[in-house]
């Protein structure tokens, strides 16, 4: 891959505040892109998640990586705010948007891992769907016209898992499966206009929240395997980011449109590594250590 294959390209990473979204934004910056980073957690106003990370921090990391980071606070559940965000990009960049990444989530505090549907709080579950699915629909509704007008671009829907395996909680499973279907449906409608759309999942992602939960940092993350042995096979957000940057730089990415992809299925093709030079493959670890307990991952959707 060229050193800066995305120089001159414009990207929007919705939900780029932390985790996979931040990792993707930074790696798009490494590849030379101008990256608009949007979300609710800003230096001027936080979100109900109560996390310390901000969109401004992510934008600064994009700058430090060699790209251009632009933070724009927006609640992607509010159509007016998303419309204003896209209008700003159009005005700033002469209508150009090459990459749309939708990594909006915010569902961790709403996920009930203990109860079946009939025992769950309905309002809480529906709020999860609004955050995790409706936000993606709203974002694409306003951003896609920029790509369609130029007859080029890539839409990336970030999810969890790329198969039909049940994900352990009704509303969580519904949200993550729906995001894959969003990519499939967008691919069908965008194909005549030369725009690709796909879904992508990381493996066991070392997000800030996961690191906090295990009481470690990115510097000593391996110590987290004491509490969770499977964490030894985790991957950093940069690994997901490098996968997306490789896809965005691939002139033949249209061949992957409509598919549900994974970091473990792409590192061999594109040759990217994690920050420590390794190439984590969580599907291989699953087959070795988890399949007897949880069943096979299944074939990609």
For the regions a language model picked out, list residue spans one by one:
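Short-chain dehydrogenase/reductase
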Residues: 1-95, 105-116, 297, 301
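Rossmann-fold scaffold of SDR-type NAD(P)-dependent oxidoreductases
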Residues: 14, 97-109, 132, 157-159, ...
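Amphipathic alpha-helical dimer-interface segment in Rossmann-like NAD(P)H-dependent oxidoreductases
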Residues: 105, 127-149, 163, 187-188
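Catalytic loop of short-chain dehydrogenase/reductase
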Residues: 106-110, 118-124, 128, 154-192, ...
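A short helix-coil junction within the Rossmann-fold of NAD(P)-dependent oxidoreductases
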Residues: 92-94, 107-112, 142-151, 250
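Active-site loop of short-chain dehydrogenase/reductase
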Residues: 9, 67-68, 95-97, 146-161, ...
């Amino acid at each position: 891959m060229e050193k800066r294959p995305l120089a001159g390209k414009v990207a929007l990473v919705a939900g780029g505040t932390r985790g996979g979204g931040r990792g993707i934004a930074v790696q798009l910056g490494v590849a030379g892109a101008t990256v608009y980073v949007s979300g609710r957690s800003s230096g001027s106003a936080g979100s109900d998640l109560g996390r310390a990370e901000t969109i401004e921090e992510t934008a600064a990391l994009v700058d430090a990586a060699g790209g251009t980071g632009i933070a724009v606070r927006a609640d992607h559940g509010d159509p007016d705010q998303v419309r204003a965000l896209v209008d700003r990009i159009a005005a700033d960049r002469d209508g150009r948007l090459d990459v749309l990444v939708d990594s909006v989530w915010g569902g961790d505090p709403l996920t009930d891992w203990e109860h079946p549907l009939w025992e769950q709080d309905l309002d809480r579950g529906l709020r999860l769907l609004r955050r995790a699915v409706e936000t993606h629909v709203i974002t694409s509704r306003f951003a896609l016209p920029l790509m369609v007008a130029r007859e080029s671009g890539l839409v990336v829907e970030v999810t969890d898992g790329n198969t039909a395996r049940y994900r352990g909680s009704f509303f969580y499973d519904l949200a993550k499966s729906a995001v894959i279907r969003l990519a499939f449906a967008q691919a069908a409608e965008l194909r005549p206009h030369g725009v690709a759309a796909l879904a992508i999942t990381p493996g066991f992602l070392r997000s800030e929240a996961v690191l906090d939960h295990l009481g470690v940092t990115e510097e000593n993350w391996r110590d987290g395997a004491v509490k969770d042995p499977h964490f030894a096979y985790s991957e950093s957000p940069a690994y997901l980011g490098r996968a997306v940057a490789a896809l965005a730089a691939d002139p033949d990415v249209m061949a992957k449109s409509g598919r549900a992809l994974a970091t473990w299925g792409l590192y061999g093709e594109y040759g990217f590594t994690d920050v420590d030079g390794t190439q984590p493959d969580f599907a291989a670890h699953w087959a070795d250590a988890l399949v007897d307990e949880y069943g096979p991952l299944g074939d990609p959707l």
